[in-house]
């Protein structure tokens, strides 16, 4: 998942004069001794002063940066010269550099090194940031200038990328309340302010439940667990002052392997219930009431703009265009997915019965018996595969792929060359391997720890641009791998290896940018997962398998027969994977397509899943009380379908590589991919970009073939 953690404020404001890339700018900077606002110094065009982050400076920095930012906005809005692309749209691109730098630090505190002290400040800042955004979106004079450029004669004479920049600026106002007046205008601002606080509270409640619930087990409760998990759990327990025990933390990276391998059914149930009850424990961290208020406020807000529901507003400028199109795709896949689940459950039940387990398959059994079926049917042991999946070697494999496709070379920087925010973080310089030109830096924060949110994500501290001189990229990937004992290799699951490649795809999307204006580094939500999903396919290429999937003890490459088993099992468990995702995506769309007055979130979730005939042996990937994608901000609200929308493109593009003379490393097709689908970022309409690559629109058949489902007519 890409989540740059600059909060919804930064995401929304990017299209109208808030540069959130942290780009250095001597001209539009503020004069301040506050380290969080200072120009970035040092090599590589300057880098964040992560080693000087001072939480006490955060609130004063926001107050100063927002005030100076609004003053610069007023200068543009009150310019007496006739509005032009240069004095309005480009002028807006120059505003917000210090605030962009500040949001880079804010994102680190929020996602990587959060503390109770920060979360208190975050709660105070959220409504202030919302008010700041509203002052920009409701600046009538500024919107008038933007609209004049958008509707004026100059528009036709602009380059295509400049036209798109102008369109994005116009939509940033028109779709966010700029046309409202009087009481409606005031109410819109009040809703945004309240939502900002609710989103922050929701996210902090989930994090509190993740940090507050840890299961400690003893030696006699380790049956079935791999040595790598046991060692990591021992380290996690020691870090929490529970020497001699083993900690199962309340995160996916700990829950998933425990449910897959533990022979202790009662403990599996306990871990499952704890994980899927985050934000749903009837205490002061319970999110159900927040969900109802969030949905009602979103609905009220878009009604002020004239839309029937939130989903209609959200999808208007996405690839799907309207909710019906997104639902049509998901509902086309759903029947095949749940049919496969029923087959998978029957297979698992047969294995359990043959072993005399005397149980009915429940959600906390699914992963455990799925693994036994995999072993029985394909003679494939996931833990055996894991012995060949070393984190460091996977990173080298990603660098190899980047070199072949993008002509990038990654050079490790010595510790201390640039500041980092935690000792776990390492940094690489990225250069063009042919010319030697500097491309940017790549930061990696790989390990789970207290204060770091769960999951995996990518972000950029600075984006590529050239309109005021070239600025190079500062990109990062963040994961939650379980750190092993000192000196021991970090071994990961096949799914985690795919996720590692996925998030690196986001980083490559940033690093390959060739756009002129910073705003064009943004993206369309149901398209931005395409590039990252596509990069996952290179994990299974022969070049990666033969050279980087090597045994952590012997150094021997993964055996051909084990690779064959992996390939044979490629569509195994697609019922589970597709159904848990689609259930979340469908519920997201339904939440945002109704009038939520009087909503009971828990009842709505249960009733919606019942209407879908959701198999009882599976739970949604993200239950409503911890569905941070859609309730801790608005980035994925009515947009979680975007992963599947993007996967249609992914599967279709993958078939293009499979058919190419050089396969996945075909030089001509790789160049076409980078030029048309990576480097252009959001400078071109995504549908147009894909047609330039493929020669046609993507087709759903490739997706169905990928998952082993029947292809619809």
Which residue stretches match the model-derived regions?
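Bacterial N-terminal signal peptides
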Residues: 8-17
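C-terminal, non-catalytic "cap/extension" segments appended to globular domains
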Residues: 24, 28-57, 64, 224, ...
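N-terminal helix-rich structural modules
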Residues: 27-227, 663-665
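Short His/Asp/Glu-rich catalytic/ion-coordination signatures at enzyme active sites or charged loops
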Residues: 42-57, 106-125, 148-190, 249-289, ...
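Active-site-proximal, well-structured secondary-structure segments within enzyme catalytic domains
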Residues: 161, 165, 197, 204, ...
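Catalytic Zn2+-binding segment of zinc metalloproteases
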Residues: 308, 505-517
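Short pre-active-site segment immediately N-terminal to the catalytic Zn-binding motif
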Residues: 482-501
């Amino acid at each position: 998942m890409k989540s740059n953690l600059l909060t919804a404020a930064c995401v929304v404001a990017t299209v109208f004069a808030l540069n959130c890339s942290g780009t250095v700018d001597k001209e539009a900077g503020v004069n301040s001794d506050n380290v969080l606002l200072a120009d970035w110094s040092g090599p590589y065009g300057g880098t964040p002063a992560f080693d000087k982050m001072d939480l006490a400076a955060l609130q004063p920095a926001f107050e100063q940066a927002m005030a100076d930012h609004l003053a610069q906005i007023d200068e543009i809005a009150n310019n007496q010269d006739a509005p032009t692309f240069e004095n309005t749209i480009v002028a807006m691109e120059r505003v917000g550099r210090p605030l962009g730098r500040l949001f880079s630090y804010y994102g680190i505190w929020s996602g990587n090194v959060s503390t109770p002290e920060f979360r208190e400040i975050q709660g105070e800042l959220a409504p202030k940031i919302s008010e700041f955004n509203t002052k920009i979106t409701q600046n009538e004079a500024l919107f008038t200038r933007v609209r004049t450029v958008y509707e004026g004669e100059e528009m036709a004479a602009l380059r295509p990328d400049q036209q798109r920049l102008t369109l994005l600026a116009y939509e940033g106002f028109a779709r966010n309340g700029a046309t409202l007046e009087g009481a409606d205008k005031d109410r819109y601002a009040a809703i945004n302010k309240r939502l900002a606080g609710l989103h922050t509270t929701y996210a902090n409640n989930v994090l509190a439940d993740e940090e507050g619930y840890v299961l400690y087990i003893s030696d006699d409760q380790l049956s079935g667990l791999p040595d790598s998990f046991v060692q990591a759990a021992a380290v996690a327990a020691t870090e929490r002052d529970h020497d001699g025990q083993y900690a199962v933390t309340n995160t996916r990276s700990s829950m998933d392997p425990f449910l897959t391998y533990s022979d202790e059914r009662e403990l599996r149930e306990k871990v499952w219930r704890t994980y899927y009850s985050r934000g749903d424990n009837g205490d002061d961290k319970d999110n159900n009431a927040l969900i109802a208020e969030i949905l009602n406020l979103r609905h009220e807000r878009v009604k002020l703009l004239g839309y029937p529901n939130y989903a209609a507003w959200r999808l208007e400028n996405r690839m799907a265009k309207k909710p019906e199109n997104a639902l049509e795709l998901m509902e086309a896949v759903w029947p095949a997915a749940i049919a496969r689940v029923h087959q998978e459950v029957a297979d698992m039940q047969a294995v359990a019965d043959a072993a005399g387990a005397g149980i009915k398959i429940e959600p906390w059994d699914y992963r455990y018996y799925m693994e036994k079926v995999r072993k029985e049917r394909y003679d494939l042991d996931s833990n055996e595969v894991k012995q060949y999946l070393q984190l460091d070697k996977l990173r080298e494999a990603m660098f190899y792929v980047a070199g072949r496709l993008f002509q990038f070379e990654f050079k490790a920087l010595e510790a201390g060359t640039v500041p980092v925010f935690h000792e776990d973080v390492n940094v690489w310089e990225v250069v063009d391997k042919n010319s030697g030109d500097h491309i940017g830096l790549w930061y990696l924060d790989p390990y789970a720890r207290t204060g770091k949110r769960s999951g995996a994500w990518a972000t950029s501290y600075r984006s590529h641009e050239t309109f005021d001189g070239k600025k190079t990229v500062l990109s990062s990937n963040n994961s939650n791998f379980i750190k092993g004992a000192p000196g021991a290799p970090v071994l990961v699951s096949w799914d985690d290896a795919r996720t590692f490649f996925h998030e690196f795809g986001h980083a490559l999307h940033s690093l390959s940018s060739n756009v002129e204006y910073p705003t064009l580094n943004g993206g369309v939500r149901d398209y931005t997962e395409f590039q990252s999903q596509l990069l996952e396919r290179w994990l299974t290429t022969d070049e990666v398998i033969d050279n980087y999937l090597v045994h952590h003890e012997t150094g021997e490459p993964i055996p051909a027969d084990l690779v064959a088993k992996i390939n044979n099992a490629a569509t195994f468990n697609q019922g589970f994977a597709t159904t848990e995702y689609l259930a979340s995506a469908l519920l997201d769309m339904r939440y945002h397509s109704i009038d939520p007055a009087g909503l009971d979130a828990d009842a709505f979730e249960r009733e919606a899943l019942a209407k879908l005939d959701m198999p009882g042996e599976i739970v949604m990937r993200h239950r409503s009380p911890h569905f941070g994608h859609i309730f801790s901000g608005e980035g994925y609200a009515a947009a979680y379908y975007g992963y599947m929308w993007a996967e249609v493109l992914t599967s279709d593009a993958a078939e293009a590589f499979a058919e190419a003379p050089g396969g996945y490393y075909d030089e001509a097709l790789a160049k076409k991919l980078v030029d048309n689908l990576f480097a252009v970022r959001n400078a071109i309409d995504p549908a147009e970009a894909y047609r330039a690559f493929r020669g046609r629109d993507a087709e759903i058949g490739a997706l169905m073939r990928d998952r082993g489902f029947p292809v619809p007519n």
